[in-house]
């Protein structure tokens, strides 16, 4: 079975410092371990880029993180200019910056998505405020000639319909969701962690 933990009490993580994010992530892991989880997907870019190394060092359970998909965007970009829309916590993280440095020949236009997560959580996906924010965040990327937009927050795929209305059709949108699902299935199979009918665990 799958256990889904949403830390709504402490969300959003994007504006928190690394120490807070690590502490909250460990608290969440401790809760999930009490539910007999055999593998944990850290389904948050900010938590992954700030805390997953600490989690892997402290716990024996396998962790799968979700990171901004810079690699496929940079490798496939024809203009060698890509955009990334993410939280402040993700863009400031050491893990993100190490990844970005690997693609120094590609210009990466970074934009913090201030206010987006809260609007999504409040259900304001099509509000004038949301559309205004997206326009202000994406317009400089379009002007810089990006051909890929990386969504660096697990909330942002909810905004793909709105984003597509703003971006020219040739700009491709990438998020990490499908890759994380494939990696999760791979690890479950390799470690034989998939449960049978009636088995406990998540």
Where in this protein do the model-derived segments appear?
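Non-catalytic structural scaffold of enzyme domains
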Residues: 1-202
